[in-house]
Amino acid sequence: MPKYFAEKVLGHWLYFTTHCILEAMHVHASRDSKLREKGAAKFFVYADGSSRMMVQGTLRDHEVPVIQAFIKQHYLEMFAKWQELSDNGFYGETASR
């Protein structure tokens, strides 16, 4: 499962799965080193870098805005990684290819 970055953010891996590429660009956040979706938070990412949390998972309330700020700061890098495997664009858009 592709990680967006080699390092964790607040102790969470940020990643997506090969099953995820059928949806719009999004980010899972999980402490689980096996990157299972169970317990993972899920954020759909808009074209401006803002995100919408769809599932909180095991994230604590105070961690949510920190993860969202990180996504906003790095969303273009993350999107480039996403596009290596997916034809789908940002949340609310149609396929980019």
PLM regions: where:
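A short, structured beta-strand/loop element
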Residues: 18-62
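Well-ordered alpha/beta subsegment
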Residues: 55-97
